[in-house]
């Protein structure tokens, strides 16, 4: 598999994952999106833990599609 093919597959996976969080299709993931998604996955995180996740993403409380894709690449 070529590097560009692998990158394309990662981009598609990131897009699908982003859409699971951004259920209202705002174009970004905010605190409420993160809270709801984690709860649906059975992860009952505190407000502080959720906020820390957003802070670690280096955002202003909103994770854009592009920022999410960059994070996805680093954790994949």
Curated annotation (Swiss-Prot):
CDD domains: EFh. Keywords: Calcium, Cytoplasm, Nucleus, Repeat. Transmembrane segments: none annotated. InterPro entries: Centrin_CML-like, EF-hand-dom_pair, EF_hand_dom. One of its GO terms (cellular component) is nucleus. PROSITE patterns: EF_HAND_2. It is found in: Cytoplasm; Nucleus. It comes from the Eukaryota. The keyword DNA-binding does not apply. It holds the Pfam family EF-hand_7. The keyword Cell wall biogenesis/degradation does not apply. Its main location: cytoplasm. One of its GO terms (biological process) is spindle pole body organization. Residues 9-44, 43-76 form the EF-hand domain. One of its GO terms (molecular function) is calcium ion binding. This is Uncharacterized calcium-binding protein C1687.14c.
């Amino acid at each position: 598999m070529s590097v560009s093919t692998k990158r394309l597959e990662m981009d598609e996976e990131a897009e699908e994952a982003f859409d699971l969080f951004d259920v209202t299709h705002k174009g970004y993931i905010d605190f409420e999106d993160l809270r709801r998604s984690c709860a649906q996955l059975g992860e009952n995180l505190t407000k502080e833990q959720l906020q820390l996740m957003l802070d670690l993403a280096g955002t202003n409380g909103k994770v854009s599609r592009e920022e999410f894709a960059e994070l996805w690449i680093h954790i994949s």
